[in-house]
UniProtKB/Swiss-Prot annotation:
Residues 33-45, 204-213 have a biased composition (Low complexity). Homodimer. Gene3D superfamilies: 3.90.20.20, Head domain of nucleotide exchange factor GrpE (2.30.22.10). Belongs to the GrpE family. Keywords: Chaperone, Cytoplasm, Stress response. InterPro entries: GrpE (IPR000740), GrpE_coiled_coil (IPR013805), GrpE_head (IPR009012). The keyword Transport does not apply. This is Protein GrpE.
């Protein structure tokens, strides 16, 4: 019976077959491993894609919510600004009305001081003393009104303006042309830019004329002298 060493070519062939078989087995295992790894990679990629898609959806939802919150904040801020401005305006209007009410109560006192000043005759020391006392109080009142934003309007010599003046008379004037304020009976005042009291004035109707007005009585004209009729002579028969 021949031994294994008797057929060395068979031994080499067997070795080659075994080597080839081992190689095929190794390749098969690598292929299986590669296939398994590819499947795992595909599954991981699919999971990652789904996770990314979900995160994108959540990000879009978050962005939409943020946009809604921003719009809500803008509306709330605008409402607050409107409320603040309205409150400030109402506060200023109330303060303006209160100042106007106070000034209108003070102005008659100022008028009284000015009338007294015009009527007072400074002939004695007592009269001058009273005048100085009046003037001190008058100056305090005027200064107080100035600090509140009150100013006296100039009327005489100004064109008549119904927004500033109240005409109570119309009279001829040699100094001022027609429709110009000629006399001021009571001064007008402003509180800031607001007219709080119109000036009571007389408006010029133009230069006076020497022609008699229609109401003047007409001067009777002299009648022509009549010639007396001569008496008739009686007829004698």
């Amino acid at each position: 019976m021949p031994t294994e060493d008797a057929y060395p070519e068979l031994q080499e062939e067997e070795i080659d077959v075994e080597a080839e078989l081992e190689k095929l087995i190794l390749e098969d295992r690598e292929a299986e491993a590669s296939t398994s790894s590819g499947e795992a990679s595909a599954e991981a990629s699919q999971d990652l894609s789904e996770t990314l898609k979900q995160l994108q959806q959540e990000l879009e939802i978050t962005r939409q919510q943020l946009k809604e919150k921003e719009e809500s904040y803008i509306r709330l801020y605008a409402d607050f600004e409107n409320y603040r401005r309205r409150t400030q305006r109402e506060k200023e209007e109330f303060s303006q009305k209160e100042r106007q009410k106070f000034v209108l109560e003070i102005l008659p006192v100022v008028d009284s001081f000015e009338r007294a000043q015009q009527q007072l005759k400074l002939e004695t020391d007592r009269e001058r003393e009273v005048h100085n006392s009046y003037q001190s109080v008058y100056r305090l009142l005027v200064e107080c009104l100035k600090k509140m934003g009150v100013s006296r309007m100039k009327s005489v010599g100004q064109p008549f303006d119904p927004n500033l003046h109240e005409a109570i008379a119309r009279q001829p004037s040699s100094e001022y042309p027609e429709d110009v304020v000629a006399v001021e009976y009571q001064p007008g005042y402003k509180l800031g830019d607001l007219v709080i009291r119109h000036a009571m004035v007389a408006v010029s109707s133009g230069s006076p004329t020497s022609e008699p007005s229609p109401s003047d009585p007409a001067t009777p004209k002299p009648e022509p002298e009549s010639t007396p009729a001569s008496p008739q002579n009686p007829q004698h028969s």
